[in-house]
Structures are given as structure tokens and as C-alpha cells.
Amino acid sequence: MVAQADPAAPAESENPGRLGLLLSAAMFVLVVDTSLMNVSISAVVEDLGTTVSGVQSAIALEALVSAAFILISSKIGDLFGRKLAYTLGLLGYAVGAIAMVLAQDLRTVIIFWAIVGGLGASLLLPSMQSLIHGNFTGIAQRRVYAMVGAAAAIAAAIGPLIGGFITTVLTWRLGFALEVVVIAAVLSGLGLVKDVKFTGERRIDLVGAAFSVFAMGGVVLGILVWQEGGEAVAALLAIGFISLGLLAWWLVRRKRRGEVPLIDPTLFSSKPFRIGISGQMMQQIALGGLMIALPIFLQMVLEYTALGAGLMLAPLSLSMFAIATLAGRRAGRRRPAVIIRLGFALVAIGVLLVIPLVPRIEPDTGWWLAIPLAIAGAGLGLLVSQLNNYTLAPIEAERISEAAGVNSAAGSFGLSFGLALAGSLMLASLAFNFTTLANDSAVLPPDDKEQVATVLNEDAEVMSNTALEAQLAGEPPEIQAEIIRINDEARPRALQVALLVPLLAALIGLFNGFRMVRMPDVKPKADLEEFALGG
């Protein structure tokens, strides 16, 4: 089997303190990157002359590439060396960040930030886990795992605030320039990294890898193409689901023939592992839906600056960080299944409270979101603290690395799926509401209704009311007021529809939580601390 624990004993780094800091910095950049993009949506749209749907497609695509290639990337590290995979991952991220600094159009963002940067992310996470395991021993190893995990948690908590401040006070491009500086500093410490030799079987299941890429890619790209009004939606979705079925068949076939599969299908014989993977996916779908819908609402509807949006999102991110930290320290006092069930319940309650507030919130009452978002964030924090260990607990030590890779891929796919589906439903709802409200209007002339609906369907998604008023400057006052009214009514409705994605994900997770509680607890068969990075 390809993904095995390395039997070679770890060797202590020559400068463990500095190497630990550099690895933590790499993880910080990995997590903060998407937060920066989310809170900068309106600025990126304006600066590049593109659309909100285009930028959110790039965000979803970056998560998709990371998910689709993370399994094969871990095998590449086994084959060519974990240090090389780590270096290529850093370089991929650097290329993506540099492209964002210099980008003049959306195509550059998609090619270099989403695709190249996504490939970099898929290489970084599995190689970092192996390198930490191979460069540190004993207490030092546990300390570095804690440092890197803390860096990820802190980045998730303060990323929206950092990104919002830089974007509002200076420019969003500076945030990505700072990422380049951090990555350069991390690359300067490559001499401290000792490569970790892999002594297992050096073969890669290329057919299985292709099926996994087509399965994830077909589903998410189908949703993104639907969002953009493309005609290949059915074909892409069919490719995705057929590839998923072929992947399952192929893995079982290779296992029975004694050949090396991309993933050992017997991993899924464990019911806790299957339910845990599902929970991981639901958690990330919920997070992805919130990540894309709320920043767009805050910036494009309430017209908050990036900093204002970051501050409004702070209750979500800070409560997630605080509760995850607290729950992690108190682990063992409650059954993990009970905590997971409570986590999904809190996410569902938080989203349920947000949905009716959306049409009632004005720019000066955005703080109404604070309590619901804090509740949802607390739920996500509970899930972050428990799901990873629950999922991996039934897996034997020699297969834990492979299982952690599957867990990471499921989470990344869930994030990309949530981003894509929530964004697509929001735009579909916008199109429907624009058309319906324009046709029902008693103010707009009959000959203009179809034209207004078409214009709003194409342009209103990227325009604030202020920008729309400027564009309508030559129209009669009553026409201006009516179009602004349509804009005001359609957008909150669209956000409410988008929020059904995280709500449904939380409810499915809650259902799974009840199933978990009815099952007996599983005592971990391996030390899971080092695999906390994969959650």
C-alpha cells in the first residue's frame, strides 16, 4: 500500500525552534489566503473590472483543485520526496500570490491563483505533516504540531480582520504581497528541513487518481458552469457522478487483484469513519456557504468596506477559534459524538436566526448579525475540535496517514461544493427575482420591463445601489427609484436562498450526530495529534 507510516525514526532538526516557526508561518499563509480573498471581493471586482460570480467561481475553483489533487499529491511526495513536494507547494502558493499582486483580469486570477495556487495547497498539507513527523521527536514534535495547528486557528480567526484592514486602508494587492514575503522567508529556511525518506511501495494509481479528479471536478465545475449560464452543466455533472462510480469500482478491483489502489477501499468498512467523513464534508459545506454569501451581502448590499465586512464577520471567526481551543483543552470530559451533535445544532440555529434578519438589516444595524454568527461560529468550533479525531479513531496506525488524506480531501471538496452551490443558488435567485419584480412593476413601462430585467440580471450582482444610481443618472426619477427598489428586494431574497445551503448541511450533520450518539465510542488506535492538520 502506498500511504504507509514511515518506519525510519525521525531525526531532530538542527534548529528546531526556527523550523517550527517557519512551518507555522507556512500554515498561516495557507489559511489566511482565502480569508483575504473573501473580504476583498468588492475591491477585486472593481479593480479587475469583473463580476462577483467570476470572483466567487475562482474561490470555489481554488478549493476544488486542492481537494481533487490532495490524494495524488501525497503520493507524489512519497515518490519524489516530501521536501520537494513541500518546496513545490510553497512555490505554487508564491506564484498565485504574485499573480494577485499583478493581476489585471479574472483570467490571471483563475489560472495562477486558483489553479496553480490550489495545486500548491494540495502539495503543502500532506508534505508538512510528513516533514514535521520526520524532523522532530518527542516533546519537540508535539510542540510543533501544536504551533502549526495554532497558526491555522489564529489565521482563520483574524484573517478577515487583517484582510479587511489592509484592503480598506491600503489595497488588497498588498495583502497578497505580504504573503509573498512570508513564503520567501519560509523558503529561505529550506536548508533546515531534512527530507523524509519513504520506504513503502513507490507506485501511483494513475487511473484511480484520474477518476477522483474527474469525480470532484465534474460535480463542482457543473455547478459553476450553471452559475455562469453555460450549456454543459448536465454533461459535467454526469461526468462527475459516473467517475465517482467508476472510482469505487476501480479501487475494489485493484484491491482484489493485490495491486496498489489510490485509496484502500477497506477504510470505508468502518462505520464511524464513513459517518465522520460525511460530517467533515457537511461542516465544510456549511462553512463554504457562509464564507461566500455573507461577505457578498455585507459588501454589495450593505456597502460595507472590506474592514467593515471583516468586523461584522469577526463574531463567526473569533467564536470558532475560542470554542475550538476551549473544547480541545477539555477533550475527554464529554463524548465526542455528543459534542459533534451539539456543534451541528448550533450551526443550524445560528443560520436559522440569520435568515429572517437579512431583509431587515440596514447598514447601521449590521451588528444584529453578531449573536447569530457567534452561535454558528461556536458550533463550527465544536466541530473543528472533535470531528478529525472522531473520524480517524477507528483506523489502525499503519493506515492513519492514508485515512487522514481522505479526510482532508473530503473537507476540501465540501468547502468547494459549499462555495459553488451557495453562490450559484444566490445568482439563480437574483435572476429569478429581478425578472419577476420587473415584470410585476406598475412603474416601469411595458416595453422596458424585459430590457430592465435583462440588464439587472447581468449587472446588478456586481453593483452597489450607489453605483447603480450613478448608472441610472439619465433616467427619469421614478424609473431610478423603481429599479433601486427592485435591487433592494431581490438581493436579500437571494442571500436567504444561498443560506439554505449551510442550513441544510448543518441539518444533515445533525442527523448524523444522532447516529453517532447511538454508536459506541471508539478508542483511538493511533496517536492522532499529528493529523490534526488535516481536518
Q: Model-found features: residue ranges?
A:
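12-transmembrane solute porter fold
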Residues: 17-32, 37-39, 52, 233-236, ...
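Helix-breaking motifs and short loop linkers at transmembrane-helix boundaries and internal kinks
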Residues: 47-49, 81, 102-108, 170-171, ...
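Central cavity-lining transmembrane alpha-helices of secondary-active solute carriers
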Residues: 60-74, 125-129, 314-327
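Hydrophobic transmembrane-helix bundles of small-molecule transporters
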Residues: 168-280, 286, 304
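Extracellular/periplasmic helix-loop-helix junction of adjacent transmembrane segments
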Residues: 40-68, 107-110, 302, 307-312
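Interfacial helix-cap and linker-helix signal at transmembrane-aqueous boundaries
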Residues: 44-45, 76-77, 162-170, 223, ...
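Transmembrane-helix exit segments and adjacent C-terminal regions of multi-pass membrane proteins
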Residues: 1-31, 253, 272, 389, ...
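Helix-loop-helix hairpins in multi-pass membrane proteins, especially solute transporters
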Residues: 75-208, 225, 230, 234
